[in-house]
Amino acid sequence: MVWLLLIVAGALHALSFAPDPLPDWTLAYVQVLSMAVPAFVVFSTRHIGRAALAAFVFSASSFCVGIYWLYISMNHFGGLAAPLAALAVFLFALYLSLYAALAGACTAWLGRDMNVMRVPLAVGRPLLWACAWTLGEWLRGFVFTGFPWNNIGYAHASSLLSAWAPIFGVYGVAFLAALASGLTACIVYYVKHNRTGIMAAMASALMGMFIVSLALSRIVWYDNQGPPLTVRLVQGNIAQQMKFDPSQLMSSLQTQFGLATRPAADAQRAPSVIVFPETILPTFQDRMAPEFWQSVVDLADQMKATLFLGTPMHTVDDGKDRYTNSVIAINANTSVQALMQAQLPVYDKRHLVPFGEFVPFGFRWFVDALNIPLGDFDRGQQGQKNFAVNGQQFAPNICYEDVFGEELLPSLHTQADGAPGASVLFNVSNLGWFGNTWTLRQHLQISRMRSMETARPMIRATNTGSTAAIDAEGRVLAQLPTATANILDVQVQGTQGLTLYARVGNGLIVLISLLGLGVGWIQKRRSRRTKPVRS
């Protein structure tokens, strides 16, 4: 019965990462209450293996439901047989759940000798749970290149706990979310054992956490940078089969350029920047005729705007070919010859997608089984320049790069050439591989968290969704319906100033979590030394 409850709780937990199908205001409650189930099981057992298995089962259920959309890319677009695609998603979910199992085992091992019937020590287990879970999330975010999707902190993009994002980042929000679930589990535990005094203390701690969060939410972490700009975001909704069909290339480009050149609803607010999705041009820039690129430069001149355009780029560096997934900036003054040679403002993607943009060692057989146009790209260099337009500094990121929040931080600081740091973040993506599924809404929540961490607006131009504009406090100002072809004209106010998280990254919350486990280990040793010896 316990294991079935954990599976159901995990499935409900998966619903907390995007407002689909649940409304946005419920997500934080669903996350905390569902995660309280494995916390209760972990706190109630002295067996490390049982605690690890409880956290593992809960997490595996959550991931199987929460990242089901990977099946669509492998089966519908990759041609992988349905059983094999389902098995691949299942095995991946099991791998991701190992970090939760580690958190459960660590909590049980360090907490089982605590005297939890005393108020000062009663909060020990929830704190250990929060520290261990946070470290598990952090490890999941970089081991084997990392996959921090559905970090529990993202469930709180609209909750009071998000006020901690400018201080500790999403891992700090995850720490507090895990702590809230642990305190909730303790409240049930002490009610069950008729210890109302300790239960009241746990409830007070939980309430205090949200009161402090409310106070923090009043802090403004940024100043406005210059006047706002009008930005046009293009959502082409080009079918994947059409996008990578050479015979359909010009048709798909005409569709998206046609959207880009629509008259502005307010002639006084014509767009200064037009952002296209990732790989709007699904071939390398030097494989297109100069006449094509001249037409793009003419489009920029016609619109009196700078175009941010996603395209693969081919360059030659010291006699070696380099292939990158990139974003380029084009305006009326761009030289076609320089463009063909990649001598223009360009950002090359740094965090590549395993299986999509590079093949992990030992997995060539898996890639060969997929019928997807995969690339073998080179990684972009560190310290790439932002795009400067009308006094604003735009920092690009491509696809799921904005899932790795700490990697965006260097763009916020003064650049090597003395240029100011980014005042606007922008993401270009093509999530068409995953259909009109939860992943579109989940990615939007992730981008909202990046805005809160950095106190910067984030604009998102995607092929199928979610195309949106987010302000520096993580609020969605406007968005397009998914799976539609349209444009979104928005006023974007750039910002300046550095949050604490922008200065220190994930290091602070990781250190706090390690210290918490260290204190738990010291307490465990003391408890063992003071145990009476049985005769």
Predicted regions, residues:
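Conserved hydrophobic/aromatic beta-strand scaffold that supports enzyme active sites
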Residues: A14-F17, A105, L233, V327-A329, ...
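Active-site catalytic loop in hydrolytic enzyme cores
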Residues: I72-L87, M114, G141-P166, D321-G405, ...
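A generic fold-level signal
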Residues: D24, F144, G226, K320-R322, ...
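Non-cytosolic juxtamembrane linkers/loops
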Residues: A205-Q268, G432-H443, R448-R460, G465-V504
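Soluble catalytic regions of membrane-associated enzymes that act on cell-envelope
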Residues: L214-F358, R379, Q384-G391, P396-D402, ...
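Membrane-embedded alpha-helical bundles of multi-pass enzymes
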Residues: M1-V220, Q254, V428, G435-T437, ...
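CN hydrolase (nitrilase-like) catalytic-core segments centered on the catalytic cysteine
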Residues: F92, L96, L281, M288-L309, ...
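Alpha-helix termini
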Residues: R112-V119, A264-R269, N333-L339, T414-A419
